[in-house]
């Protein structure tokens, strides 16, 4: 009799506590997910010399955008800059 009461209480405790364990796991996943996304975004938004060959291509939905820019105010020399950006 005592053993059956023990098992009943044991199963009630498991059923009562189990949702808390699941919620904790979901919270842990939500906490680590932004860190992974942030790392991915940093690797997607990188400066490059050209958009050709896409060795380290832009991550979707980012696209490679290039433009020419003068090196300094008094210089006529232009430099090509490329960067992954959202369009």
Curated annotation (Swiss-Prot):
Residues 1-17 form the signal peptide. The keyword Heme does not apply. One of its GO terms (molecular function) is toxin activity. Transmembrane segments: none annotated. Disulfide bonds join 44-59, 51-64, 58-84, 66-82. Keywords: Calcium channel impairing toxin, Disulfide bond, Ion channel impairing toxin, Knottin, Neurotoxin, Secreted, Signal, Toxin, Voltage-gated calcium channel impairing toxin. The presence of a 'disulfide through disulfide knot' structurally defines this protein as a knottin. Modulates Cav2.1/CACNA1A voltage-gated calcium channels (P/Q-type currents) in rat cerebellar Purkinje cells and hippocampal CA1-CA3 neurons. At saturating concentrations (>10 nM) decelerates activation kinetics and slightly increases peak amplitude without affecting deactivation kinetics. In vivo, does not cause death when intravenously injected into mice. In rat models, through its activity on Cav2.1/CACNA1A, has an ameliorative effect on memory defects provoked by hyperstimulation of N-methyl-D-aspartate receptors (NMDARs) in the hippocampus. This is Omega-lycotoxin-Am1g.
């Amino acid at each position: 009799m005592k053993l059956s009461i023990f098992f009943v209480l044991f199963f009630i405790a498991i059923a009562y506590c189990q949702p808390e364990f699941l919620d904790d796991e979901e919270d842990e996943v939500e906490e680590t997910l932004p860190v992974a996304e942030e790392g991915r975004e940093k690797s997607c938004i990188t400066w490059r010399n050209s958009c050709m060959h896409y060795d380290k291509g832009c991550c979707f939905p980012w696209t490679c955008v290039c433009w020419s820019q003068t090196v300094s105010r008094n210089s006529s020399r232009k430099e090509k800059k490329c960067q992954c950006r959202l369009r």
